[in-house]
Amino acid sequence: MNKWTKIFACAALCSGILAGCSSNDDAIKVAPLPLITASVEVVKDWEHSVGNGSDDFFTKLMPAIAYGKVFASDRDGIVAAFDQETGNKLWQVALGEEGSFFSTQSAQLSGGIATGYDKVVVGAESGMLFVLNQADGSVVWQKQVDGELLSKPLLAMNKVVSVLGNGKVIAFDLETGEQSWIYQQDVPALTLRGTSGIIENQGAAFFGMPSGKIAGVLLEDGRAIWEAIVTPAAGGNELTSIIDVDSTPIILGGTMYAVGYNGNLAAIEVRSGKVLWKRDYSAFQSLTINGFNLYLTTADGHVFAIDRRSGLEVWSQMGLENRGLTAPAIFGDSVAVVDFEGYLHLLAQDTGEFVGQIEIDDDGHIAAPLSVDGRLYLQSKDGLLTALSIK
């Protein structure tokens, strides 16, 4: 219990632990590490340390893959590029070093890295947005905004779009750094520590809101298209009134899927914003999808497969309760999640049964694994970047 409390003190509210602690500490029961018979063998292809990682902050530092490279950062300002195949370091820059904008202070990088248009983009809790050249890491431009940048930006239509911690969504010209538009949303008095990622579809940007809604705006000028309620406002105490949609929506076949905290998993028609179905699940981690199944990890560490056509539950795995799971990722024929002790767990996609397990880094993980070209890439809290494959 002491180890759990230490590791997740900053994230207690996000993981739903605070609600249990507020009334009865004994109600928090962390599942023991499952003892399994593995049928899938996972091997480490390469690993590298990227600075100091998140420095024990609740910062979802997540790598990005493009141009045959893996890009990763630490909270202090290190951004590095590695060869995707071999893991060899290609370049590294320090955005928080003496002589930079931040002098000797940490750059406070946060959220994920975005790539596109030969650029690498990363934001900071301080409100600084950095745009780098993907070839060598040189700074193309940087811009101060009036809010925290806590999630991965979107690069689309030659713009970089970010959701700020104060509820604003802001777009800049990717080449010049000039502001293109700004969209303002109301923010409740009490919200989770985080913001939704953004996705693009047919010239529009879609993102979750602290008010329990999904919003769509035109990328060209930021005009609102529609808002859809994932989780309606609720009464009760302050904790139950937190209804953020901090997960990044996903779109497939004209339907968007999103999940909220203290709320619902919803399927939404992209064209109109009409809610097609809702189911009662509480999550702040993003979803993943494969075939007809949606996969999600709930705030209390349960893993579910949901039929995306009907919203009906296909299977559930309760054996990782309160182990601080990341969002899921598809890895071969398995669903991969990582827990607070740094163990990667593989679940069969069709049944949810445990099929593999390996310890990656005992410092633990917050950001979701990244599955690309048959490999799984993970970045731990202490900055260890690991590439895995199935033997």
Predicted feature residues:
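Structural signature of WD-repeat beta-propellers
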Residues: D74, Y117, A124, L164-G165, ...
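Short loop/turn segments that connect beta-strands within beta-propeller blades
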Residues: Q84-T86, N133-D136, D173-G177, L219-G222, ...
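Loop/turn-rich, solvent-exposed surfaces of beta-rich toroidal or solenoidal domains
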Residues: Y295-A305, L312-L346
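Bacterial Sec signal peptide processing site at the extreme N-terminus
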Residues: S15-T37
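Extracytoplasmic beta-rich repeat domains
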Residues: I28, I36-A64, Q92-A114, V140-A156, ...
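Sec-dependent bacterial lipoprotein signal peptides
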Residues: M1-C21
